[in-house]
């Protein structure tokens, strides 16, 4: 798969030049003499070979690493240059096109899922009904009925917020994980999703998580059986330890694996004290699927015009990305 020009880090293999042994030097011509008896004969001179030059070992290709600078550039592109991304707005459609193009540049097959969003209240702002979309990236020749993983983040924001932490941070990590997966592969085929209309337009499940609910409705029986786990990345750039969460219905297997990986990778994490239902993983969990969530640290700019790129801590973004990549590998 091709890598994104924005986050491209050129890897150059240094191949060694093989040098064979130099030929033996020719012996000097000897004057002709009469035959001697063996006891009187002198040994003939042996040619001396020049030692061969050792063949240098090629340098090993270093493992791909999470590029925090590239992820922060994506946060700035979404929350700084585009800004608020209400799920039914032109700004959302612009951001969805941007994400789709990035996935394509990485070599993924990209589809979009369109779905309706009702009128309502977006964090104090009346909003009209409209349509939103999910952006779905799958590896080439992906078979949805075979064992696979999903990792996703919602792309939309409430009406007034630029949404740097909520949730350009999650989308930026998803894009960087997709790049790494294209370079090195993952333990199971992985689907990357930017969900639309996660943010509520009212209270209760019926007015929340529209994109992920639509995705789950579209899953056939074989796809549900093939999905081994879904992880949502939501608000992953604030704090000094990565929140590791699960919901009230799913087994804690994903959460526990994250905690073990964090110990191995020496990444600071915190187990969520309560079951979490406030992100897109909840739509999958309600359908009986295994899920987890990274993120959810409270912060002052939540759902406000103050949710700007400067809110996002690059170190926390890196912790989240490295932990998620360890889970995918």
Label each PLM-derived region with a short phrase.
Residues 22-63:
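Ser/Thr-rich, Proline-interspersed low-complexity disordered segments
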Residues 51-96, 106, 156, 233-234, ...:
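N-terminal capping segment at the start of a domain
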Residues 84, 109, 116-119, 142-144, ...:
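Solvent-exposed loop/turn segments at secondary-structure junctions
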Residues 17-21:
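Bacterial signal peptide processing site
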Residues 158-257, 261, 267, 273:
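Acidic/histidine-rich catalytic neighborhood of metal-dependent amide-processing enzymes
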Residues 77-140:
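A non-catalytic alpha/beta surface segment that caps or lines the substrate-entry region
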Residues 229, 236-329:
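Active-site-adjacent substrate-binding region
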Residues 1-15:
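Sec-dependent bacterial lipoprotein signal peptides
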């Amino acid at each position: 798969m091709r890598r994104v020009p924005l986050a491209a880090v050129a890897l150059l293999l240094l191949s060694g030049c093989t040098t064979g042994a130099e030929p033996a030097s020719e012996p000097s011509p000897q004057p002709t003499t009469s035959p001697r008896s063996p006891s009187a004969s002198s040994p003939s001179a042996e040619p001396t070979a020049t030692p061969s030059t050792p063949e240098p070992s090629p340098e090993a290709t270093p493992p791909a690493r999470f590029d925090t600078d590239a992820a922060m550039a994506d946060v700035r592109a979404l929350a700084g240059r585009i800004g608020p991304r209400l799920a039914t707005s032109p700004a959302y459609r612009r951001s969805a096109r941007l994400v789709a193009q990035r996935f394509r540049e990485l070599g993924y097959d990209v589809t979009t899922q369109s779905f309706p969003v009702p009128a309502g209240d977006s964090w104090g702002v009346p909003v009209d009904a409209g349509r939103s979309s999910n952006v779905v990236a799958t590896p080439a020749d992906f078979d949805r009925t075979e064992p696979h993983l999903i990792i996703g983040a919602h792309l939309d924001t409430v009406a007034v917020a630029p949404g740097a932490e909520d949730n350009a941070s999650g989308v930026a990590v998803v894009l960087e994980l997709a790049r790494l997966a294209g370079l090195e592969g993952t333990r199971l085929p992985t689907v990357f999703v930017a969900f639309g209309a996660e943010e509520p337009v009212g209270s209760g499940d019926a007015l929340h998580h529209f994109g992920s609910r639509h995705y789950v409705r579209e899953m056939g029986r074989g796809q549900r059986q093939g999905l081994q786990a879904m992880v949502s990345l939501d608000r992953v750039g604030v704090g000094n330890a990565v929140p590791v969460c699960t919901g009230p219905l799913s087994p804690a297997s994903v959460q526990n694996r994250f905690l073990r990986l964090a110990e191995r990778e020496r990444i600071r994490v915190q187990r969520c004290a309560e079951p979490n239902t406030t992100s897109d993983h909840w739509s999958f969990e309600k359908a009986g699927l295994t899920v987890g969530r990274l993120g959810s640290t409270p912060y002052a700019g939540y759902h406000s015009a103050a949710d700007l790129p400067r809110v996002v801590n690059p170190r926390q973004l890196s912790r989240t990305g490295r932990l998620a990549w360890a889970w995918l590998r």
